[in-house]
Every structure is written in structure tokens, then in C-alpha cells.
Amino acid sequence: MAGLQLMTPASSPMGPFFGLPWQQEAIHDNIYTPRKYQVELLEAALDHNTIVCLNSGSGKTFIAVLLSKELSYQIRGDFSKNAKRTVFLVNSEKQVSQQVSAVRTHTDLKVGEYSDLQKTQCWAKEKWYQEFETRQVLVMTCHIFLNVLKSGNVSLSNINLLVFDECHLAIQDHPYREIMKICESCQPCPRILGLTASILNGKCDPRDLEEKIQKLEKILRSNAETATDLVVLDRYASQPCEIVLDCGPYVDRSGLFQRLLNELDEALNFLIDCNISTHSKERDSTIISKQILSDCRAVLLVLGPWCADKVAGMMVRELQKYIKHEQEELHRKFLLFTDTILRKIHALCEEHFSPASLDMKFVTPKVIKLLEILRKYKPYERQQFESVEWYNNRNQDNYVSWSDSEDDDDDEDEEIEEKEKTETSFPSPFTNILCGIIFVERRYTAVVLNRLIKEAGKQDPELAYISSNFITGHGIGKNQPRNKQMEVEFRKQEEVLRKFRAHETNLLIATSIVEEGVDIPKCNLVVRFDLPSEYRSYVQSKGRARAPISNYIMLADSDKIKTFEEDLKTYKAIEKILRNKCSKSIDCGNTESEPVVDDDEIFPPYVLRQDDGSPRVTINTAIGHINRYCARLPSDPFTHLAPKCKTREMSDGPYRSTLYLPINSPLRAPIVGPPMNCARLAERAVALICCKKLHEIGELDDHLMPVGKETVKYEEELDLHDEEETSVPGRPGSTKRRQCYPKAIPECLRNSYPKPGQPCYLYVIGMVLTTPLPDELNFRRRKLYPPEDTTRCFGILTAKPIPQIPHFPVYTRSGEVTISIELKKSGFTLNLEQLELITRLHQYIFSHILRLEKPALEFKPTVADCAYCVLPLNVVNDSGTLDIDFKFVEDIEKSEARTGIPNTQYSAESPFIFKLEDYQDAVIIPRYRNFDQPHRFYVADVYTDLTPLSKFPSPEYETFAEYYKTKYNLDLTNLNQPLLDVDHTSSRLNLLTPRHLNQKGKALPLSSAEKRKAKWESLQNKQILVPELCAIHPVPASLWRKAVCLPSILYRLHCLLTAEELRAQTAIDAGVGVKSLPEDFRYPNLDFGWKRSIDSKTFISSQSSSAVESEGDCRLNTTMVPDSATSSAANHVIYTQTNDQMSVNCTPLCQKSLSDLRGVCFSEDYKAINGVSCNGVTSDSEAESGVCFQKDERIACTQEIPEKSTSFHIQNLPKENQPILNECTLSKKFLDGNVSKPTSDECPSTCTSDMQYESGLSNGYSSKTLGPNPGLILQALTLSNASDGFNLERLEMLGDSFLKHAITTYLFCTYPDAHEGRLSYMRSKKVSNCNLYRLGKKKGSPSRMVVSIFDPPVNWLPPGYIVNQDKSSDKWESNETSGEGVMANGKIDEDFDDDDEEDEDLMWRNPKEETDFDDDFLEYDQEHIKFIDSMLMGSGAFVKKIPLSSFAPPDQNYEWRAPKKPLLESAQFPSEFDDFDYSSWDAMCYLDPSKAVEEDDFVVGFWNPSEENCGTDVGKQSISYDLHTEQCIADKSIADCVEALLGCYLTSCGERAAQLFLCSLGLKVLPQVRRSVTSTNSISASSSYQKTSTRDICTLNSELSSCKGVEYGYLKIPPRCMFEHPDAEKTLDHLISGFENFEKKINYPFKNKAYLLQAFTHASYHYNTITDCYQRLEFLGDAILDYLITKHLYEDPRQHSPGVLTDLRSALVNNTIFASLAVKYDYHKYFKAISPELFHVIDDFVQFQLEKNEMQGMDSELRRSEEDEEKEEDIEVPKAMGDIFESLAGAIYMDSGMSLETVWRVYYPMMHPLIEKFSANVPRSPVRELLEMEPETAKFSPAERTYDGKVRVTVEVVGKGKFKGVGRSYRIAKSAAARRALRSLKANQSQVPNS
């Protein structure tokens, strides 16, 4: 047998590397890429009468339905007016309904079904006429139709298509035959389509077959076409070399073979003879035994004794299990008998050979022959790639370590538990060439043959390269239901296939399962170990040998070889007949391997340049180029686009070809080739011409390769930015990359320090209490102090005018105070002395009252960037107007208590005298403690009933006097003086948001009001001081309270001015809005848009844990942080939740009657009266009266539609002495006796004039014309980390979707020829975070952004101050921390003061010292020391959230220098920091000296833990910057900010304005009309940005804007949507026949029907020659729907929070939802595609939807029912369905002249039910839900391939199980797995009682 010559890849002349079968892309070079056979059959059927011979039923439906759809234009319309009808004939009644449902699913045709012959026989002619009138497709049994024809009820000429199912029946005598006879006489005859799957059954004689086919063709007057699945599967692949080998007989030298055979035969005969009577119910006792023994016998015969021994051993193990579980005695006996026989066989074998090694004497010749073939495939040494030495060094015995060998004495049946050794992850070097399958008949043969090959590999180095495995169908125990064990088996099979696909194994031993339908690679060796028994088996296994050089070897025993040769002849003949019937009858089998002729002479190549190496296409390579080009066009997984070439012989001899490219190629016209003298050349020549044309239009690049989407020919779109030269690590545009930017200073405040003798501006800071603190929140029952009750207030003195900005709130202890900044007078001058006085007072306010001065800051108003003065104003002289209160300023200068403690001495001679009026509005200072940093208290109450001799609250001291004597050795001179109840002056300086609400405006839970009340009423918990021991501060309490608001007011003013400046800048750059606002105009108030929920209802136990106590009024359960401590560690308000938004919606006040409103002023809507302040009315009455301004009881205040602001708009100041509007004076009853005391006229409060309902803005201006409200712009600049009452997240989402829409529309209109892949590439470049970040940076957004929490002591620079580098101590660095700022005990880390008693768990004091209320500072000091100590020791006991390891020692070599300033005080922050909020750091990095402790007077400067404490990565670069003047921002945050600003312009000024805004940023979304001056300095500007100081940025921007001479026009709809075509209109009418029904259904008639056709045309539908496919419209529609839905959600009155908004958006804008809706509204019935797989997926999906009939959630329960729990597979959602849902939106948009309203009018009714359903209950993707539920424990596996080519993903929830999901893509499988896991977890949760 040595003469066997195989052409193996290794020996092939093309060298070793040709022939790695899996490395070859299936792109053909000599023939056009073949199209799916179903597509070609359909084409044949459209062309002529056809009999389709198919193997599968499903393919038949596809062809029949699509054919009737294609011809449907003939059957729509009126039957009486010549429209025809289509008839489907089936053989039996039950097939009728199948066909009907197929037609109904895929078309909108009206279908009639007729299956009852009796019933229809009695119908009259009229009845039939009516049926034909009302139906377009009639499905009936052939008997009924024959009846109809015979009775002359209908004529065949009225039928356009007759479909015969199972048409082979026409050969016998059958109604089909008679129907055809009638057809013969009728002219014109209908088109005929015959379908059959059973031309071939079992063995049949080729002559008969041919005769049968010809007869059928004659009867049906058709041509038979076979599908390629009956001929070799890919008929274009080269045919494998077929070899039949005679293996010779087995010579049984030892006689063992015969003995074993005799044993087995005897045993089997015994079993057959035991005819135990079996009742039909019982199972046959001998069945298992017979099966096992005959399997063993078969192995013996086919493979020989060695294998029989192996299989006997396996079977014994398998039998043990049966025996163990067998209950019945008789059955057991038979099993034991079998066991004995098998053991006997094993014993006999052991006598002859040792089972350990393979002895060739004991295997059959077939096996020997097989091993010989395999040796031929051994790869050559030189093919070992780089690993030759590795190969040589391996000794043979360890070699198999990477295969799945197992030990022989492994006593687990290895079928069930194959213990695989771990495999190396790389394909073994041995697997590089062979890729083979051995087909065997029986399962056991496969198992043992595999074992044998592995054994041979160990002994024979020639075979060592084989890594084999076996796969046997799911044949295990057909008689048991599929159980866990089978599941294991199944998994194992899939693993085997996966390895074979990945070429980890190179040889597969398989039963016939692999012949059909399993996805495996192209093999280069197929061996039929057992001969094929029928044609189908022959052709299927042969079809697996598809590699370019492959062998199909059949092994025959000598006795069988004769008969098999006969069979083989038969198979060949059948194949030939079928091939001739193949729809492409040119036999192209040989063209692929034909010798290459030099055809260049015949037809010159297309060469780019005339030099040698120039790229060229020759006539021989052209087809490959075309195939490659088509493969690169965009398509879905189901469609493989291929060119279509028609070749016909011309009358005079030569051939000519016409080439049609897929319809989404820009080259649409058919290309006609030159006449050539053979068909092959004609095809090549036309390809060459096509290549030339493709290159000319730019579809092939200059190397003549297809142009990818990246090499876009539209360079101008990807405006290439100069890559910034920067050392900052991280990818530009990502969150990881962070950089520092100076904080912007508004131009109007820059250099605004007034100079002597120069005109100044004086502004009043008006403060009005608009919403007093409701009682529930006023725990201490403090008196509220409305700021407008006292006339003395603060003002701002500046050298420049300040633009109008909206009023805004601050939140003091008394409630919400509305702040206004009003110009008092301008143009006046001050002399030097006055200015110095004012400046000193200004410094005094910030350094002493607010104690914000620290070593790092220095007061230098002349140098500071921003240095206006804050000064007290009062009503001076008699004029009644406010002016600078110089007298008061001088008084303070003179006062002793100004800074320190005056040492007044009282004695018995001059005792202390108490004057009540001195204490009524006073701040007092205890004179006996804390001398360097005295504490200041407000006098809350004077206890006239207490004296120093009253009983002391705690038992240690009798009286107050005794306490002071004992503790401080102080004697009192006046024992009758009353005592004072005092409150701390506030150290909480961030008053931007209310304390009792979180950022969402939701009430924080409060601790029980009962406890509080009790606590505050007992003296123990009050601070009580003796007047004599205190000094009175010169600044009255009323003014002090206003001073506390200054940092917040100035900060907010600063931010709003920055926003106003941005608005003005945009007005110049983009032409949106006006540069300077009109004098008489003021924007509505800044407002957080919260509905205040302070109504008692909402408070009651908002935490389930706090039980509601029985007695008492309302319960408030929250834990607040005590306020007795003035710890700097606590100067911050940190909110529990940080995502929020400034709402822009108006909540109409509930329609309550007035009486209801009374007293509930603070219920849900109390914010509605936020901004009202009426001149001369005190706040209490005014707040309540304000409720009912509007006649219709709705607060009306909208500013354009989207921006609705809940507050009133305080308009222009009333002229002096203008009467108060009468709406404000309500009935006395309502005012509750609170009669208003008029305040001085000029008090800075304003009056609400009539409200304009619609515009919401006074004097007819609207934000549409003026530009957005600075408050809204500020929202767009505020990150959620700033913990303000609003942030950019909602606006950002809106901006994001509008940006996508604007850019999409622009690209769609500007590039009518670019296909979807290129468009989306350009879009992704433009909308990328990286691009937006660059544009935002160029515009200077980063400086204007608000990124961290406002914390005055830490990061606010008061006006007039500069950062002083020498003493800087806020410098530090860190690498990663969570900036959450929640304190250790989960409380909100607010400052320790204000509004609240100490909560028990936060008291550090000893219970013994309780009494020491007077001295409770001590405890604060000690607590501070403890805190600092613990910090330095590194225990972090105080603020758990800060991981100590994250501090890095300052980096000595790295200094970041701030522009044009001395080295600043700076703090170093890591690059990953997310716009950190520093407050929680404050305590550590800096302890204000003002808060230093008297005992140890130390200051902790920069805190630097020891080295080993720093777990920071050395490589991480830290950024060192100064907290006061700079901020560190992630690139992505800047991109977000740009989107939010876009959203802000969109909501305020409309879509056109938003587009202009984008253009001004540098994102082109509109065409330019003309350019007057081109801006030259823009580039220099952006590059110099980094190096400029803050001061110059603004000036730089303004220079730029002046030279923007660009005007933008409007987008134009791309001109043509139809191609030039001779009879385009007629084709269009054919193609869209029936679409009018769809137009009715969606209620939109198309003006241009071509858009409608385009929206439904899939890329595979080549019959549409007049429009493009839907991909471009889908690209457009996707963005439009996304924007419309996002906009709708954004404007929802429910005001969804950003998180919900995101979830809703992703739940509604996704393929699953769109596909479901498309099916619900019948889109699929009009869909035009020719793609068999897509057809089936849609079919499945539609059926599934009909069964479910329930709309989908996220990808909600998209799976089949639960029978098959083991292998969860999601039903596949056909992407094409979602696509046409989108493309139709794009089509409507274009057809309606780009009207979004029209699209929404059509789509809203479809989407509305879902929007409602989801808004009520927001769905989340299962993957996300699982990860949120089990964040630590859920782990997803990588994807595995299943045996049919799908993907499986396993998710393991540690401790709760593993869950698998399967789907066509990783994503689908992953969500299936997640869904199963969730179902299981939820089921388990519900069983566990709530513990």
C-alpha cells in the first residue's frame, strides 16, 4: 500500500503555507462570489416556470412567499378590472394553514384558506367570484381547485401564479396532473412554481431519476432547478480528490478475533432466544443487554480485538450504573449476565496482549490504512513556524500533554467524565496543517477509534502531531429524557467542536451528525471509515472537504468493494444529473483551477501609473477585486453582498456579460462588458471595466483596494486638530485625563477696585426672606429673622458696572432668602480717606467676622484680580434712601470689642448694669475664655425669670453664680441680672442650598421631633450665659446674619456673571441672543426647580427603621450633625445624592382652594412663590399672600416651552413711592393678623408686576431673542460634583441627542453619496468626547465651569485677596480618593453648627461633663485634637471615606507654575480625581488658626503621612494646583459641559439657535453662506490659551469674535432620491404596489413615494434598481428618533432625574423596542429583502411577538418559553426590523421637508404606550440590574462558541450558582444569562422571609 499518493497540503507544489485551510478568506478570485442558492432559485422562478428541488421545508416557504411578493403588483387591485390572483395548492388539508400563516406573516396580502372539499363543493359561482374578489392569495387543497376549474367558476387566465407544493406527486395520477392538463388549453398560462423535497429518497437509479425529472418537467411545463444543498454544498469550491481504498481482509493469526466473535454471537443468540413475554406496557428486559453486546460486536468487526477490549472496559463501567439503579430482579439478571460476558472478553484479551500498549496485530486493516493516511499529513519540520527547537526538544511521551488523553485505568467512564488536561492556550504547532474528519457509523466506534489514534500517537512519532477528538450526536440513551448527564454530554460536544474550529484539535472523529448543519471549518481530509450508504450521506460528507486542496477518501473492506463501486457510480451519475439542473448550468467546477493563461494581450490591464511597480488590475485579477469590494460594503450578519453577473451569447457568436453591483454601492448602473469569444473571458472583462469605474469614482483607492470608511474622501469633515502637545497622561477626552485650568473671573469684576476721585458704582445686596423655615424644621423653635426687617444691609462698591443677573436664593437659618443686586447710584466719587476706611472694613468683614483669612491668603486689593469692596449701607439722613453708612464704619473702627475682648472691670462700687435694649440685636463674646479666638454668640432670648442665683441645671453646682466662681473664680457684681439664651454665630458659610434637603430637593430624613423638642426645652441643652461676663460686639446680630451670607452671595454672583458673560460672548460668536440686555429687562430668578416637600406628610418616617412614636405632632426622622462645634472639619454641606438638575418646568400649583392653601404654604409647591417680594410688605404676610396671585390659581411662568421656571420673575424695580400692587394685599383673614409694617421705600425689594403668561419675561422680551437665562447657563456649567442644587446632567443628555441629530442631518444632506459606514464614521469622529473636549477648551469653557463644592474656608478667594506663595499650606497631592464626603457614621458631613443640636452619637464629651454646657468648647477642642491625632496616627477614625494610603508625599521635582503669578498656594491632585470636592479634606490639610485650640496652640500645616503609608503608584503623575484660583477637570467633563450648553441653548432659544451655537464652536452643522473676513488668529488663540493667564482669556475671546464674518444658511434636502432610469416611474409603481395600505396605517401619505420604497429596501434586494437601500435613511432616522424621544422625556412634567432619564432613554431607544414596534405596526409585511436567513429570523420573531402579544422591555423577556431551562436562548431580534423602523422616520423627515413635528406626529402614537409604561416603571438592562444587585459576586465568562455557531456566556454569581445564556452575539447571550440569573435570584429572595 506504499503506493498511496496523496496530495496533502504539505506536499502541494504551492508550498506549505498555501493550504492552511482556515487562513484563507473565502474570497474567490476566478469566479464571482456565489450567492445563496435560495436567491438564485428565486431568480430562476421569476424568470421562467420552475420546479425547485430542495432538501429542506423552510427553503421552500422562503421561495414561494418571496415569489408571490415579487409578483404581487399583478394581484393588487380589483378582480373585475383585470387584476389577477395567486393560488397555492397543497396536497392535504393540514398543510393549508401552514402556508396561510407564512403568507400572512410576511406580506400584507389578503389570504383565503379553503380546506373543506364538502363545504366548498356546494358553493355557487357567485360565492367563488366573491372569494376571488376579496382575496388576493388563495391557499387550497388541489381537489378543491380542480373542482373550481372544472365547474368553470374561475378561469386560469385570471391567475398569475400557481404554486404546487409536493409537485412530484404529479407524476402519478393526481389532481395536480389534471390541473396541468387544463393549463395546457389555456392561454396565457399562469407562472408555475413546483416545490419538492423528495425527488431523492434513499437509493435510486440514476436512469430512473433522470426520467422522473424529465417527466415532471414535461408535466409541469417547467425547468427543474436543484438547490446546491443536494449537490456539493458550495458548487464553486474545488472538488475534492475522491479515492476509494481497498483495505484487504483481516488475518486473524492468533484466533482471538474468532473467539471473541463466537462469545458475543452466542450471548446475543441466547438473549434473542429468551422470549420473555413482554406486555406492551413493560420494557423489554433484554433491550439494554442486546444493545451493549451488539455495539461491542460491531467494534470488534470494524476495529479489531484491541478496541473491543477497550470498549468492553467502558461498557462494564456504564453497566455498573444501570445495575446499581435497577429495581427489578429480572432486569438485573440480564444486566449481570451482560457484565459477565464483557468481563470474559476482557480476560480473553489480556491473555494475548497488554492493554497498555497498542499492538498492530490486533487492529483491522482499515485502521492500519487510516493511520497510514494520517502519517502522510505529518507536517514538515520547516513548517513548524518559529518553534522548531521546541518541537525537537519534546520527548514523545510528554508530548500529548496538550491533548485530551486520559489514562487507561481511569475508572470513570470517560464519555461522561472526560478529564481533560489543561491545554496551552496557543494552538499546538502540530495542528498547523491537517484539518480532517473521519466519519464512522456508530457512536462507540468513534469513541474507541479516538482512543486508538491517541495511543498510536504515543507510540509512533510520525503520528505525534495529531490532536484528535470525537463527537457523536446526541444519541445517548434515546429512551431516557434529556437529563443533567446529557446536558454535560452536550456541553462536551460543543467544547469539542469549539476546539476543532479553533484548530486546537486537527482531527475529528464523527458520526453522521456532522454531515449536516453543523458549523465546522473547511477540511482538507475527509475519510469515510464506514462507507456512505446513500447518496445524501455521500454528498454531505464529501461537501465537508472544502479546502482548496482536499482529499475525500473512502475505506472499503475487500468484500464490500465491488458493491460499493456500483453505488459510487450511481452517486456520481445522480450528482451529474442534479448538477445539470443546478440553476447556474455552466459547469464552473473546472474554472477555478484552470491554468492561468496570459490574457493580458486579449484585454489590457488597468494600470494607475506607467511604471513597473504600479498597482494594476489585470483581466485575471479583476473578479477578485470586485468580490473584495462587495464584501466591504455595509451589510448585516445575514446578508453577504455579492455581485450579480449575467452572461449571454450574442446572435453572432461572441459572449457579453453585464455586471450588477449590490444596491448600496455608489456605482449603480449595470456595467456592460465588451463582446469576448468565451463566457469566462466575458465575465472577467466586465469586472476589469468595473474596477476602472470604481477607481474613477473613488471607491477603490490608489492601491486599487476598497476604500475603508476611515480613509474618508471627505477630509474637511474631520477637521484635524493639531494634536495638543501635552505631558498629561490619559487618552484625550476621557475621564482618566485631567488638567488644570484657572478659574474664570468675570470681566466686569476684574480690576474693579475703586480709585479715589474716579466715578464708582454702588450696588445694594437686597435680601428678602421669601420662604420662612417651616415649623417642622425649626427644631430649636428659634425666632426667624427676616433680613428685610432691618434697614442696614450690605452693598458692593465697584469701578465697573455689573450686568443684570437673575435674583437667586440663599438658605439661612430663617429660611430661603432671595438675593437681588440692584444699582443704587453711579457716577459718584470717593476720596482716598473714605476709600481706605471702606477697604479696612471690607477686610474686617472677611478676616474677623467670617474668619476667612489664613496665612495663605493676603489682602492686597490693588494687586488682586477681583477687588470690589463690600460695605454696610443704611438709610442715612432724612431722604429715606440707602447710602454708605460711614458713621457705622467709624464706630466699628473705634470699638474695643472689634477684634479682641475688651477688659471692662466691674466692682461692687460700679456694678454691672443690665440694659435690655443693648442685648436685643446683639452678638456677645464671653470674656473669660478662648482669649485669642473668642467665640461669638447671637442673643436668642433674654430670660428675665432667671438670675445668676437660679438653680443650676446639673447637680454639681447649686447656682449659676457658684458655677462661675468654682470654675473660673469669677465674682458677679449684679445678682439680679437676667440670663441670656444664646446661639452660636454661624460657621456654615455655604448657604447655596438648604440644609434639610438633599440635592434632589428631597427632604433628608430627620430624627424624631419628640426627642428634639424635649431636648431644646430642657435647660440642660441650652447655652446660657451671664450678661455681665460677656462683651457686646459692635456689629449687631441682624447685620452679622447678613454677613454670614456674603460668601455664598458673592460666589453665586460671580458664577452668574461668568454665565452672563458666556451668554454675551455667544451672542457675538453665534449671533444667538443679544450682546447686552435691555435696561428694563430682568431674567426670572435662579431656582432649583424643586417642589419643596416640607409638608409633614412627607416626613413621617422616611426611613422605615424609625418607628413612629405614639404621641406628639409630626415625626421628623433624620440625623443632623450638631452645631455646637465650629470645627473647620465641618464647614461643608455635603449632600447625600449628587446628581441633580435645575428643573426647567413649571409645576402648576395644585388646584386647591385658598383655605386649603393656608398653612400649607410649604407643601409640595411652596417653591412656586419663591421669588415674590413685595415692596413694603413683610415677609411673613407676603410669603403667604403670594400664593394666590394668579386668577386661575396656576402659577404661570414659562419661559419658552422647555424652560419653565418655577419661581416668579422679579421684574424691574418699581419707581419710588409706587403704590403696592393690590394683589399683594389680601384679606386680613389670610394675613393671619400679621399686619404688614411698611419698610422704607427704597429698601431693595422689588414687586411682581403682571406676569406675561407665555414668555414669562417682562416687557415682551423672551429668552428666544435674548439668549438663555444665565441661571440655566450656570446649570450647564455645574458638574454634579459641585453638589449644588442643580447640575448639567439633564441638559447634557438633551444636548447629546440634539448634537447627534444635528450632525447626522448635516452629514446626510451634505454627502448624498456616502454610504452609512462612512457617515457613521464621520459622525463618531465629530461627536466624540475627544473632539467636544477640544472645542470646549478652545472656547474657554473649562475656566468657567463649577467643578467642586463651594467651601469658603478652603477654596474660595474673597474679593481683594491674593494667594500668597510663602505661607501657602493648602498644597498637597493625592492619588485617588472618593470625594463623597460622607462621614464615618453615615451622617451627612455638614458643619458642626447651625440649626441643630448635637446628636447623641456625635458627642465626644463625657457624660459627667454634661453640665458643662457653658464650656462646651472644650469638648470641641478635644475632639479636634483627637481627630488630628488619629489622622496623624493614620487610623482615620473621623472621616472613614478617605483611604489613608492615598496621600503621596509632595513630589519635589514637579512644580506646576501658574501663569504670570508667583508660585501659588497650591494643592496637588491626581489625574484621576473626579472634580473632587475638597471639603472633606479640609480638616486634614489645614487647620485654620482661628480655630486653633487654647491649650495646644498648634496648626497642622500640610499633612504628610509616613512613607510606608502611601500606597500610591510611583508612575502616577499628580497635579499640583491652587484650590483658590485653579480647578482640575477631567477632559470628559468638559465635553459634557459643551453638550449641556448646547442643551441650554436648545431649550431656551430653539433648534436653529442650537445649530448656530454648534457652528460657532467649530462643529459644522449648517452650510456656510459667505465669509467676509477669515479668522486668522483662531489657531494662535487656541494654542496660546494654555499659556495665558486668566486675565487675558476673555480679552482674547472678544478679539476673536469680532472677526467672525461667517453666515450660515439652511440645509438642503439631497436632490435626488431616485436614480436615472429609463422607466423609473413604472418600476416604482410596481415596487410599491400595496404600500398605500401602510401609509393609511401610519397615517402619513408620502409626497415622494421613492422615499417610502427606499425606507423598506434592504441591501440584499437587488430588484430595486431605482433607489438606494435603507441604510442611509436608517442612519438619519436613528438620530431623529433618539432626539425626539429624549426631548419628549426631558420635557415630561414628571421631571425625571438624570439617572431615570438615562435609563428611560436606553429602554426606549434600542433595537429591541424598535423591532417590536415595527412588527406591531406591520412594517415587516412591506419589507423588501432577499435573504433566506433574515427571512427566518423575522419569521421567528414575528411568531414570537404574536404569541407574546405584549410589548418588550429593555430586551425584556425576549426569550422562548421555559421548557428548556437548561439552555436559555434569547429569541433573536432581527436588527433589520429596528432599522426600517428608523429608516421610515428618516424617510418621513426628508419627505416632509425636514419637519421633526411631522415625524413625531407619526411616531408618537406608536411610542406613547411604551413611554407611559416605562416612565411608570423604569426598565433596566438585565446585565446592569444583575451587576447592581450583585456588584461583587457576578462574573461573566468570556464567550464560548456552541456547536451550531452561536455564542454562549456563563455568569457565575458566587455562592448562588452559574447561569448560561445563548445567542447569536456575545451581547445577546450575555443578557440571556443575566436574565436567567436574575430570575433565579429573585425566586430565591421571595422564598426567604424578610429577615
UniProtKB/Swiss-Prot annotation:
Keywords: ATP-binding, Cytoplasm, Endonuclease, Helicase, Hydrolase, Magnesium, Manganese, Metal-binding, Nuclease, Nucleotide-binding, Phosphoprotein, Repeat, RNA-binding, RNA-mediated gene silencing. The keyword Magnesium applies. One of its GO terms (cellular component) is cytoplasm. Residues 1818-1883 form the DRBM domain. Residues 425-594 form the Helicase C-terminal domain. Mg(2+) 2 binds at E1674, D1779, E1782. Residues 1248-1379, 1635-1793 form the RNase III domain. A motif (DECH box) lies at residues 165-168. Binds 2 magnesium or manganese ions per subunit. One of its GO terms (molecular function) is RNA binding. Residues 622-714 form the Dicer dsRNA-binding fold domain. Mg(2+) 1 binds at E1292, D1370, E1373. InterPro entries: DEAD/DEAH_box_helicase_dom, Dicer_dimer_sf, Dicer_dimerisation_dom, DICER_DSRM, Dicer_PBD, Dicer_platform, dsRBD_dom, Helicase_ATP-bd. Component of the RISC loading complex (RLC), or micro-RNA (miRNA) loading complex (miRLC), which is composed of dicer1, ago2 and tarbp2; dicer1 and tarbp2 are required to process precursor miRNAs (pre-miRNAs) to mature miRNAs and then load them onto ago2. Note that the trimeric RLC/miRLC is also referred to as RISC. This is Endoribonuclease Dicer-L. It comes from Xenopus laevis.
